[in-house]
């Protein structure tokens, strides 16, 4: 080495001091040691400044890539993470609501199909489409929105969708309920009647009128229907004005009962006790004792009945007379005597004739005639009896002077009621005798139902007469109170005289 060449060690230390580390920060210079630098160390090649900057740039890029990779591995806790989570939650909520709507539709599908209700699939499709459009429009804003705002949006979407599904389901169920009630009402003719009876108490006249209206509404395009109408008790009872008189009697009884309650509420003390005692005595008369029909002797003629019923009406001291009732009763017994003589004549004619078919047809027709006339006679006698009770009640209420007491009138009316019921029982026996005589050659399956029907209608007729008699109780109670008031007002006047 020559003396002109510069020393190598200072050059190496100078270059090293200008280098930077990978972070482009100057490296601290190590402390100088007292030991000499080895002269045999190879001198590193010096690089230009451009090469130094190029080597530092890749180091920075690699450092940034490393940091990004590390950030992916670490769980995110910033605002960006809430966007993807909210989107997933909204999709799950929409799918759940759609499933609920589909479940409701499946539940009512059978009822809708049977009742003809429109299918709710269109409503469900519109709900799903609206939820999808709303989700698509809100996805962009949810990525940058705050978590609380996102939750509010989800709640609104779920609430609106749920309201649509639930309201649609409730409307469908309400329509199903109304349609079901209509179908039940159409399939059950007694549904409306049952509903009406639950709201009010039916009276005897209402029951009879409903039965008559129901019979009139039946189709009459068959011969059997016409025959049934001839033997229908309700239609015949209304034909003889029995239903009208029964309704009028019920009205008078109801008005009288209201007056009795009003008068009793205005009384007090001893006067109230005395009035109640008298009313109880009057009420005991209306308690009809059970009578035995077998002990009743059969009537031999019409004169006895007419005389007895006329005498009873005379004791009432009213202007009405039982002529119509007596005439209807005499007509019935006269027809019975004629029908009893007819089978004997037909039997004699049948022996002379060679054909037995004509005799059987005549006997069969005779049974139908007897049955029809029996029902008609029972309805007519019952209607006439109720008409007499109605007229008696009107005359008692509007009579100017009471010649007999209310207690005496109640006793007379009670005897009359028992007499009418026994006569109806006797009349039904006469009709069954006619049926048995005319249907000797008939089978029991044909004759027994007809006889049973006659006895049944006779029992119903007696019940109707007894019910009409009970309607007279409030009328006679008012009569008793009025007579007592008149007597109390007449006593001071007689004392003054």
Curated annotation (Swiss-Prot):
Keywords: Phosphoprotein. The keyword Isomerase does not apply. Residues 19-34 have a biased composition (Basic and acidic residues). Residues 1-54, 344-364 are annotated as: Disordered. It comes from the Eukaryota. It holds the Pfam family DUF719. The modification Phosphoserine is found at residues 84, 205. Belongs to the FAM114 family. PANTHER family: FI01459P, PROTEIN FAM114A2. This is Protein FAM114A2. It comes from Mus musculus. The gene is Fam114a2.
